[in-house]
Amino acid sequence: MHGNVATIEDIVLDLKPEPFDLYCREQLEDSDAEDETAVTQPDKQAFKVLSQCGGVCCKTVRLCVYSTHTGIRVLQELLHQDALQIVCPTCASRL
C-alpha cells in the first residue's frame, strides 16, 4: 500500500485454486452384511404394558415384556381385539 488510504489497485489478491485429495482412505465394511444382520436380529427393548384383568376383578394389570416393535404392535392388536386377555394372579388362581 502506498499512502494513507488503501485503493482497489493496491489490494492484490492471489487466489489460485489449490487441489486437494477428495478420496477418503477409510475402508467401509460391506453394507450387504449389515443389512442381513439387521433383518435377522431386530432390536429388542423393554416395554411396560398396562391392561385390565380379563377375569372378574377388572383391576389394572402391569406386564413387562422384552420385544421388537413389530412384536409389541401384534400384542397391542390382540389386546384391542379381545383376542388375548391378561389375567391378574388373584383371578388366575380361581381358574
Curated annotation (Swiss-Prot):
Nuclear export signal, short sequence motif: residues: 72-80
Record carries keyword Transmembrane: no
Gene Ontology CC terms, in alphabetical order: host cell cytoplasm; host cell nucleus
Major site of localization recorded for this protein: host cell
GO MF term set: DNA binding; DNA-binding transcription factor activity; protein domain specific binding; zinc ion binding
UniProt PTM: Highly phosphorylated.
UniProt entry tagged with the keyword Endoplasmic reticulum: no
Subcellular location: Host cytoplasm; Host nucleus
ZnF (unnamed) ranges: 53-91
Pfam family, one: E7
Keyword terms: Activator, DNA-binding, Early protein, G1/S host cell cycle checkpoint dysregulation by virus, Host cytoplasm, Host nucleus, Host-virus interaction, Inhibition of host innate immune response by virus, Inhibition of host interferon signaling pathway by virus, Interferon antiviral system evasion, Metal-binding, Modulation of host cell cycle by virus, Oncogene, Transcription, Transcription regulation, Viral immunoevasion, Zinc, Zinc-finger
Motif annotated as LXCXE motif, chain positions: 22-26
Biological-process GO terms, alphabetical: DNA-templated transcription; symbiont-mediated perturbation of host cell cycle G1/S transition checkpoint; symbiont-mediated suppression of host innate immune response; symbiont-mediated suppression of host type I interferon-mediated signaling pathway
Family: Belongs to the papillomaviridae E7 protein family.
Domain remark text: The E7 terminal domain is an intrinsically disordered domain, whose flexibility and conformational transitions confer target adaptability to the oncoprotein. It allows adaptation to a variety of protein targets and exposes the PEST degradation sequence that regulates its turnover in the cell.
Subunit comment: Homodimer. Homooligomer. Interacts with host RB1; this interaction induces dissociation of RB1-E2F1 complex thereby disrupting RB1 activity. Interacts with host EP300; this interaction represses EP300 transcriptional activity. Interacts with protein E2; this interaction inhibits E7 oncogenic activity. Interacts with host TMEM173/STING; this interaction impairs the ability of TMEM173/STING to sense cytosolic DNA and promote the production of type I interferon (IFN-alpha and IFN-beta).
Functional summary from the UniProt entry: Plays a role in viral genome replication by driving entry of quiescent cells into the cell cycle. Stimulation of progression from G1 to S phase allows the virus to efficiently use the cellular DNA replicating machinery to achieve viral genome replication. E7 protein has both transforming and trans-activating activities. Induces the disassembly of the E2F1 transcription factor from RB1, with subsequent transcriptional activation of E2F1-regulated S-phase genes. Interferes with host histone deacetylation mediated by HDAC1 and HDAC2, leading to transcription activation.
Protein name as catalogued: Protein E7
Native organism taxonomy: Viruses, Monodnaviria, Shotokuvirae, Cossaviricota, Papovaviricetes
Primary gene name: E7
